[in-house]
Amino acid sequence: MSIYKNLTMSFIALSFLFSVNQGEVSAQETPSLQIEEIIVTAQKREQSAQDVPIAITAMSEELLSSTIRDISDITGYAPNVVIGSEGRRPGGTDIQIRGISAAATTDNSYDSPIAINVDGIYLGTSAGSLLDNFDMERIEILRGPQGTLFGKNTVGGVVNVIRTRPTGEFGAKVQATFGEDGRQEFRAVVNTSLSETVAAKFFATSVQSDGWIPNITIGGNNGEEDYQAFGATFLFTPNKRFEALLTIETMDDQSALQAYNQNFNVAPGVIPPPPPGPNQTDFSGGLLSCAIYPDSCRTSPNQLPYAENDTQHDASVETDAITLNMKYDINDSLTLTYIMGHRDVKEDRIYDYDGSSAPFITIERWNEYDQTSHEIRLDGSYDNVKFTAGLYMFEKEFEQDWATGGTFWGVLFGAALSAPGQWEACQAFDGRYSVQCDVTIPAYPENGTLYQILYATQKTESIAAYAQADWSVTDRLILTTGVRWTEEEKHFIGGQAYLAAHDIGGGRNFADYADLQNKWDNTSVKVGLTYDLNNDSIVYASYTEGFHSGGYYAVVQNTSNMRQNAYDPEFSESIEIGYKALLMNKRVQLNMNYFLNDFMNKQEESTQQDPTTKTVASFWSNVANAEYEGFELDAQILVNQYFRMFFNYGTLDATYEGFVTDIDESDGVIKLENADFLTPRFAPEESYGIGGTLSIPAGQGTVDVFAKFSRIGEFETNLLNSDLGRAPETDNVNASIGYYQDNWSIVAYGQNLTDEQYEVVDPIMPLFAIGTINQGRRFGVVLSAEF
């Protein structure tokens, strides 16, 4: 461990001990000063977060920090958790929990292994899931498999978001934010009472900015924001036993995409080729687009503070959603709950896939998605048994068109297809070509502009039944058992034509369609023991199983790839041992846990050369088993009435078992070798966050000074651990200072104050590489008022 790390850890330890000692003194002076208790629904019923025997970080008061703009700003508050925005998708998220992350975040044909739930509704698409912080009551981050109660696609964990309920009293909260790059944000929530039995809440948000990375090719900026949302929530309480909570909302996000910004290819001689060895593709000699368009090559290997796209990254995601939650208390011991959710999402986007100033590859995507879910649940509480049992139904469907244009196809096939008789042969699809040419085009176009057209639609239906019970064996020992049965069916239809006219949805007369269907079922169990050491501390141990859906991947190069890319479910088995305690008169909250997660049939995606078409394609398979082992610490400290702090730390050791693949995709030879020496993606060995708030009385109000430092260790983003695709170790510092008085406040905030920027490079092996940089230092001011 480096000297810097030793000093850092020593400082943290000393700070902790000092805080505890100070707490002993201050506790006598202010015995009522305690850490806020947060009530969560991590086990489908209300409990104190400290009583839940799982690794959970619950946030409520922290959400008031002006440095938390959306859920991506939560990174650093929970160990082994990284939440980022998906720059290639409007409002998309990229979440890592304990090294588990979605192998693909840009397409609806793949389900994330981490669930985002909003008011009890599972979001089945990443588009629009980058949730705004305003009007949230709390966020619960559940780490590790949650298959028994939350079901499929939770092998990594769950981000559980709960918004505020109508108060039934007239009042309002308004907020305005102004920042760099023309940032203007306006938010409002109004509560009122419509009658003695109906309370209502109305909410609206508007976010706009001019973007933050200049595009030197076509002008303007990438990352421009234009987001509006509004809706209403109604609470109906006709009597003491029944309530119905209905939310109707719409969101319109016209923000531009942030990725990709640059082509990583550099002119020959600018950087040396990589050393000999597998999986180190040479991007230094002008591969493909750099060789064809030398003016678009980077002249420096250094990170560039601008974008070079020849296409404006326009995007749109429009969402309409309805959520209904009804609850009926049958008696003092039994409660029946019904939750229904429906979402319609329309998503469009266009982006420069080669990331350069050349008109080489431009991708356009149109997607319509809808989902409906129903859940009915019975919760019971008797003398020594508490249980939850329910039925769940989920259905989603998407339809997608995709067009890849630019000069790429002309460069690849133009010389052959422009020869006499060859266009007609390609149209006939008689075996001389691996692709078919558009029969509606009479001849090879003079400008050489061709399009690859893809179509895919998929319907998913799943049903589940579950039950979990806590049995108090003694006054201190609790036995937890749970089981969930799931059945899921997917029906996928896809077609693809390489060389076509740019006419999306115009008949879709493909030479071949893939019509694929499969059904899977799974039974997952949970067994756990919890022992109360005293009223304020517990130890627990649990064994939990999880299930991640199988399926078909739509982003491929031809219909044969669609058939080839059928992948099976992956399964997880997790052991967790933990300790939770409130110490020093509830001034210190200390949670620690060890975990061991075994994954079977782990799903992975790689970008390889298609041997039939000589272009790149996405290949999916269940590559191997994988093991994730680590330790987590999560602490909060109330030093005194003026200062509170938090600290979290996570370690992770991730390894493959039985991974066999072609470890050198660039040599043109398929050679399968043992690859257990590679590191699974998105698994930093170490991460931590530390921060605090100092409250200083000032006049009639209070000045709050907040700061947070977080560090994420380096991790692999490429399946074959390419040096080019390795994300570096990153530090992040956020801070704010604000004045709060009665019902108003003014806060100045700064994010990424050290201005640490890095480039994440995506190798499209063996053709080229594209890069995206993160946003640098930025400042803003937030004005808030309540009445």
Regions found by a protein language model. Name each.
Residues L33-E169, I577:
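Acidic, small-polar-rich N-terminal luminal/periplasmic segments of exported/outer-membrane proteins
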Residues S112-P113, T125, F134-E137, R143, ...:
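Outer-membrane beta-barrel translocator/receptor signature
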Residues I213-N221, Q258-E308, D352-T362, A403-Y455, ...:
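Solvent-exposed loop segments that connect transmembrane elements
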Residues G219, E225-T388, E395-E397, Q589-N591:
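Outer-membrane beta-barrel domain signature, strongest for Gram-negative TonB-dependent receptors
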Residues L235-N239, L378, G390-F394, A456-N597, ...:
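Structural signature of Gram-negative outer-membrane beta-barrels, strongest in the C-terminal barrel
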Residues N325-D329, T335-Y351, D532, I538-T544, ...:
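Membrane-embedded beta-barrel scaffold of Gram-negative outer-membrane proteins
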Residues K386, D475-L479, N591, L596-D598, ...:
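Gram-negative outer-membrane beta-barrel transporters
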Residues V411, D598, M645, S710-L720, ...:
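C-terminal beta-signal and adjacent terminal beta-strands/loops
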